[in-house]
Amino acid sequence: MKTWIPDSRKFAYLNWKQVEALPKQETLLVLPTAAIEQHGHHLPLATDTLINNLLLGNALEMLPADAPVYALEPVCYGKSNEHLGFPGTMSVSAATFMAVVRDVGASVATSGFRKLALYNTHGGNSSLVDVMARDLRAEFGLRTFALYGSGGVRYEGVSAQERAYGFHAGEIETALLLSATPDLVDQSAYTVNYIADVEKPETLLPENAAATFSWLTRDIAASGVTGDPRPATAENGALWTKQAAERIALALEAMLRWKDPA
Ligand SMILES: [Zn+2]
């Protein structure tokens, strides 16, 4: 899998004597979680994992060289059952996903580390990551953190409709890959589909509302796309990568500085 994580930040490139010598109380380990799942006719199955590698790798490049932060290898298989029925989607159950994160967390604690951040870029994992960040704190006393997607950055120049409902293989994901891995984007195969209209607020929304309906992609988007990839440009992808990486780097630095109240 292509990655932008600097070699010097890869936990798995250390040997055990180097791990033993790390400052365990201060070191922050980051566990990326993503997916291998359909992303329409134009983006690869690995889109969420590539975006995770891209944004985290760029953020890690921005940290001071002596900041003790290492990226664990990603959990590439996520809970993607919303995308079942499309060839290529590899989904694990919620129980399996949580068990893997729990056992990696146990190994982090057993190795003597204290700080662990979960960095997730697949929406179907988000509620599980939230649960696991708390459970790892409770079960192992780890100082856990959860970090999602762009780190909260509002990407410039995205329409209100796309911002609300372009959440799968739409403009943002397409732009990020156009800038980072253009050979993996088939610009002749764009499809457009919106699950709801931002101009017509409904009582039941698909996401981010107090009252929602639970959707499967095959119910609402035959091509597998929810959003509009057509406005995506490599230039915006590069700009948004930089914006997100800066925000993620700030979050990682705050996690490094974090001290629990005595
Ligand atoms: Zn995606």
Describe each model-derived feature in a short phrase.
Residues 1-115, 123-262:
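Extended, histidine- and acidic-residue-enriched regions that form the cofactor-binding/catalytic faces
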